[in-house]
Amino acid sequence: MAMSERRHALSLTPILSLMRIAVFCSSSPTIDTKFIDLAFELGAEIASQGSELVSGGGHISAMGAISRGARSKGGKTIGIIPQKLVDIEFADHDSDELIVVDSMRTRKAKIEDLADAFITLPGGLGTLEELFEIWVGRYLEFHKKPVIILDPYGIYEPLHALVEHLETHNFVKPGMRDLIYWATSPEDAVAKAFGR
């Protein structure tokens, strides 16, 4: 093949960029199994679409399920976890890459740095903290990465109403809710992460 033919062939080859999707979710061992199943399905969908999973690096509850789901489809998993949680045997040692950090703050910063998009599943205060930090970062234009809430069970409906209420009293600027994509299925959430 001549040099000009090789250049032409290369120009026709699509350049695919690797997508890393971070998921914020529960590590509570007492949540309903439907939330664990949802996490597993989301992990499987992320891997099925050729993306890598970035998570909090835990092996229990929804956090563990999301990684198992990704691995069930051959996906790469990257866990970011503070040493303190490794010490109490919370770490997902099956992760393809387990990054141990010194604090929760460092964990969140590393997840934000590695991820190209963020999906939040139903969760508790830690999950909400992660969501709010990414959401506010998007609002302040520290990043322009997609932020998605996957909530087929309506857990976050009161949050949506609260933000709307805060908006009516001018504590939150109009359009803040529009910075979040709301999804009701893993397929929809991952599609939104890709901007579809």
Language-model features: where?
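Acidic, Ala/Val/Gly-enriched low-complexity intrinsically disordered segments
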Residues: 2-5, 9
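A cross-family phosphate/adenosyl-ligand binding-site feature
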Residues: 10-114, 152-196
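Short, structured loop/turn "capping" segments at alpha-beta junctions
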Residues: 77, 142-145
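Active-site/ligand-binding-proximal alpha/beta "capping" segment
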Residues: 106-141, 148
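Short loop-to-beta-strand entry elements in the cores of soluble alpha/beta enzymes
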Residues: 145-153
